[in-house]
Protein backbone atom coordinates (compact mmCIF):
# COMPACT_ATOMS: atom_id res chain seq x y z
CA UNK A 1 0.00 0.00 0.00
CA UNK A 2 1.18 3.53 -0.72
CA UNK A 3 2.31 5.79 2.10
CA UNK A 4 -1.15 7.01 3.06
CA UNK A 5 0.24 9.52 5.57
CA UNK A 6 1.54 11.55 2.62
CA UNK A 7 -1.49 10.93 0.39
CA UNK A 8 -3.73 14.00 0.13
CA UNK A 9 -7.45 13.75 0.69
CA UNK A 10 -9.52 14.02 -2.49
CA UNK A 11 -12.49 15.52 -0.69
CA UNK A 12 -11.71 18.32 1.74
CA UNK A 13 -13.62 20.76 3.87
CA UNK A 14 -14.46 24.41 3.26
CA UNK A 15 -14.96 27.38 5.58
CA UNK A 16 -14.54 26.83 9.32
CA UNK A 17 -14.27 23.05 8.82
CA UNK A 18 -11.26 23.65 6.58
CA UNK A 19 -9.63 25.87 9.20
CA UNK A 20 -10.15 23.21 11.88
CA UNK A 21 -8.72 20.51 9.58
CA UNK A 22 -5.63 22.65 8.95
CA UNK A 23 -5.12 22.98 12.72
CA UNK A 24 -5.57 19.33 13.70
CA UNK A 25 -4.25 17.37 10.70
CA UNK A 26 -0.55 17.89 11.57
CA UNK A 27 -1.26 16.66 15.12
CA UNK A 28 -3.02 13.54 13.81
CA UNK A 29 -0.29 12.83 11.27
CA UNK A 30 2.36 13.16 13.96
CA UNK A 31 0.51 10.55 16.01
CA UNK A 32 0.25 8.14 13.07
CA UNK A 33 -3.41 8.79 12.25
CA UNK A 34 -5.12 9.96 9.08
CA UNK A 35 -7.79 12.65 9.08
CA UNK A 36 -10.89 11.48 7.26
CA UNK A 37 -13.31 14.34 7.83
CA UNK A 38 -14.10 17.35 10.01
CA UNK A 39 -17.66 18.58 10.39
CA UNK A 40 -19.02 21.29 12.69
CA UNK A 41 -22.78 20.97 13.14
CA UNK A 42 -25.57 22.36 15.31
CA UNK A 43 -26.34 18.86 16.55
CA UNK A 44 -26.81 18.71 20.36
CA UNK A 45 -25.90 22.37 20.70
CA UNK A 46 -22.73 22.63 18.65
CA UNK A 47 -20.77 19.46 17.83
CA UNK A 48 -17.34 19.22 16.23
CA UNK A 49 -17.06 15.79 14.65
CA UNK A 50 -13.57 14.56 13.78
CA UNK A 51 -13.29 11.28 11.85
CA UNK A 52 -9.87 9.66 11.80
CA UNK A 53 -8.24 6.27 11.36
CA UNK A 54 -4.92 4.51 11.55
CA UNK A 55 -3.01 3.99 8.31
CA UNK A 56 -4.24 0.38 8.23
CA UNK A 57 -7.85 1.60 8.33
CA UNK A 58 -8.56 0.54 11.92
CA UNK A 59 -9.57 2.59 14.93
CA UNK A 60 -10.57 1.76 18.50
CA UNK A 61 -11.90 3.61 21.53
CA UNK A 62 -8.40 4.18 22.91
CA UNK A 63 -7.38 5.78 19.61
CA UNK A 64 -10.38 8.13 19.78
CA UNK A 65 -9.48 9.04 23.35
CA UNK A 66 -5.81 9.69 22.47
CA UNK A 67 -6.81 11.90 19.54
CA UNK A 68 -9.32 13.83 21.63
CA UNK A 69 -6.72 14.47 24.35
CA UNK A 70 -4.14 15.59 21.76
CA UNK A 71 -6.29 17.94 19.69
CA UNK A 72 -8.35 19.53 22.49
CA UNK A 73 -5.49 21.74 23.77
CA UNK A 74 -4.52 22.73 20.22
CA UNK A 75 -8.10 23.73 19.43
CA UNK A 76 -8.30 25.64 22.73
CA UNK A 77 -5.19 27.66 21.82
CA UNK A 78 -6.14 28.29 18.18
CA UNK A 79 -9.82 28.80 19.11
CA UNK A 80 -11.31 28.47 15.58
CA UNK A 81 -14.88 28.04 16.86
CA UNK A 82 -16.40 31.10 18.53
CA UNK A 83 -19.11 29.21 20.45
CA UNK A 84 -18.90 26.38 22.96
CA UNK A 85 -18.95 22.95 21.30
CA UNK A 86 -18.75 19.24 22.05
CA UNK A 87 -15.78 17.41 20.54
CA UNK A 88 -16.67 14.02 19.07
CA UNK A 89 -13.84 11.84 17.74
CA UNK A 90 -14.84 8.69 15.85
CA UNK A 91 -13.78 6.15 13.29
CA UNK A 92 -15.22 6.53 9.79
CA UNK A 93 -17.35 3.42 10.39
CA UNK A 94 -18.07 0.61 7.97
CA UNK A 95 -20.17 2.71 5.57
CA UNK A 96 -17.39 5.27 5.55
CA UNK A 97 -16.67 8.36 3.50
CA UNK A 98 -14.12 7.65 0.77
CA UNK A 99 -11.57 10.48 0.84
CA UNK A 100 -8.29 9.06 -0.51
CA UNK A 101 -7.37 7.09 -3.62
CA UNK A 102 -6.24 4.25 -1.37
CA UNK A 103 -9.80 4.05 0.04
CA UNK A 104 -11.03 3.15 -3.44
CA UNK A 105 -8.28 0.56 -3.85
CA UNK A 106 -8.87 -0.92 -0.37
CA UNK A 107 -12.62 -1.22 -0.95
CA UNK A 108 -12.57 -2.27 -4.61
CA UNK A 109 -15.40 -4.72 -5.27
CA UNK A 110 -17.84 -2.94 -2.95
CA UNK A 111 -20.82 -0.66 -3.57
CA UNK A 112 -20.30 3.07 -3.32
CA UNK A 113 -22.49 6.15 -3.70
CA UNK A 114 -20.69 8.98 -5.51
CA UNK A 115 -21.41 12.63 -6.27
CA UNK A 116 -19.33 14.69 -8.68
CA UNK A 117 -18.79 18.42 -8.99
CA UNK A 118 -19.15 18.27 -12.78
CA UNK A 119 -21.24 16.21 -15.16
CA UNK A 120 -19.74 12.82 -15.93
CA UNK A 121 -21.64 11.07 -18.73
CA UNK A 122 -24.53 13.53 -18.18
CA UNK A 123 -24.87 12.76 -14.46
CA UNK A 124 -23.55 13.96 -11.13
CA UNK A 125 -24.75 11.05 -8.97
CA UNK A 126 -23.75 7.43 -9.31
CA UNK A 127 -24.15 4.21 -7.40
CA UNK A 128 -22.29 1.03 -8.20
CA UNK A 129 -19.48 -1.39 -7.49
CA UNK A 130 -15.87 -0.21 -7.70
CA UNK A 131 -14.38 -2.50 -10.35
CA UNK A 132 -11.13 -0.76 -11.25
CA UNK A 133 -8.89 1.96 -9.80
CA UNK A 134 -5.99 3.78 -11.45
CA UNK A 135 -3.96 6.90 -10.66
CA UNK A 136 -6.54 9.37 -11.99
CA UNK A 137 -9.93 7.67 -11.84
CA UNK A 138 -12.00 4.68 -10.84
CA UNK A 139 -14.52 2.61 -12.75
CA UNK A 140 -17.97 1.86 -11.37
CA UNK A 141 -20.21 -0.96 -12.50
CA UNK A 142 -23.61 0.67 -12.10
CA UNK A 143 -26.19 -1.23 -10.10
CA UNK A 144 -29.06 0.58 -11.86
CA UNK A 145 -28.69 1.40 -15.54
CA UNK A 146 -30.99 3.92 -17.19
CA UNK A 147 -31.98 3.52 -20.83
CA UNK A 148 -29.08 4.37 -23.12
CA UNK A 149 -26.44 4.30 -20.37
CA UNK A 150 -23.34 2.16 -20.41
CA UNK A 151 -23.10 -0.45 -17.62
CA UNK A 152 -19.84 1.08 -16.40
CA UNK A 153 -18.70 4.66 -15.86
CA UNK A 154 -15.21 6.06 -15.28
CA UNK A 155 -15.19 8.79 -12.62
CA UNK A 156 -12.13 11.06 -12.44
CA UNK A 157 -10.86 11.57 -8.89
CA UNK A 158 -10.61 15.33 -9.52
CA UNK A 159 -14.39 15.46 -10.16
CA UNK A 160 -15.39 13.94 -6.79
CA UNK A 161 -17.43 16.01 -4.37
CA UNK A 162 -18.65 13.14 -2.16
CA UNK A 163 -18.23 9.37 -1.97
CA UNK A 164 -19.42 6.88 0.61
CA UNK A 165 -19.48 3.10 0.92
CA UNK A 166 -22.93 1.50 0.97
CA UNK A 167 -23.56 -0.91 3.83
CA UNK A 168 -23.95 -4.50 2.58
CA UNK A 169 -23.40 -7.94 4.11
CA UNK A 170 -20.26 -8.34 1.97
CA UNK A 171 -18.89 -5.01 3.20
CA UNK A 172 -19.51 -5.94 6.84
CA UNK A 173 -17.80 -9.31 6.34
CA UNK A 174 -14.76 -7.79 4.60
CA UNK A 175 -14.47 -4.91 7.09
CA UNK A 176 -14.50 -7.33 10.03
CA UNK A 177 -11.96 -9.56 8.29
CA UNK A 178 -9.66 -6.57 7.59
CA UNK A 179 -9.97 -5.38 11.21
CA UNK A 180 -9.13 -8.85 12.53
CA UNK A 181 -6.08 -9.07 10.23
CA UNK A 182 -4.88 -5.60 11.29
CA UNK A 183 -5.24 -6.50 14.98
CA UNK A 184 -3.31 -9.75 14.44
CA UNK A 185 -0.54 -7.87 12.62
CA UNK A 186 -0.35 -5.32 15.45
CA UNK A 187 -0.18 -8.10 18.05
CA UNK A 188 2.62 -9.81 16.09
CA UNK A 189 4.50 -6.52 15.89
CA UNK A 190 4.15 -6.04 19.65
CA UNK A 191 5.43 -9.59 20.25
CA UNK A 192 8.44 -8.92 18.00
CA UNK A 193 9.18 -5.64 19.80
CA UNK A 194 9.02 -7.37 23.19
CA UNK A 195 11.33 -10.15 21.94
CA UNK A 196 13.82 -7.53 20.71
CA UNK A 197 13.84 -5.90 24.15
CA UNK A 198 14.74 -9.20 25.88
UniProtKB/Swiss-Prot annotation:
Do you know which CDD domains this protein is assigned to?
YlxS_C
**Which Pfam families does this UniProt record tie to the protein?**
DUF150_C, RimP_N
Its cellular-component GO annotations read: cytosol
Major subcellular location class: cytoplasm
Q: What GO terms in the biological process aspect are recorded for it?
A: ribosomal small subunit assembly; translation
**Compartments it resides in:** Cytoplasm
Query: SUPFAM superfamilies, per this entry?
Result: YhbC-like, C-terminal domain, YhbC-like, N-terminal domain
Question: What domain of life does the native source organism fall in?
Answer: Bacteria
Keywords from the named record: Cytoplasm, Ribosome biogenesis
Q: Which InterPro entries match?
A: Ribosome_maturation_RimP, RimP_C, RimP_C_sf, RimP_N, RimP_N_sf
* Function summary: Required for maturation of 30S ribosomal subunits.
Question: So what family is this one in?
Answer: Belongs to the RimP family.
Q: What is this protein called?
A: Ribosome maturation factor RimP
- Species this protein is from: Agrobacterium fabrum (strain C58 / ATCC 33970) (Agrobacterium tumefaciens (strain C58))
Record gene name = rimP
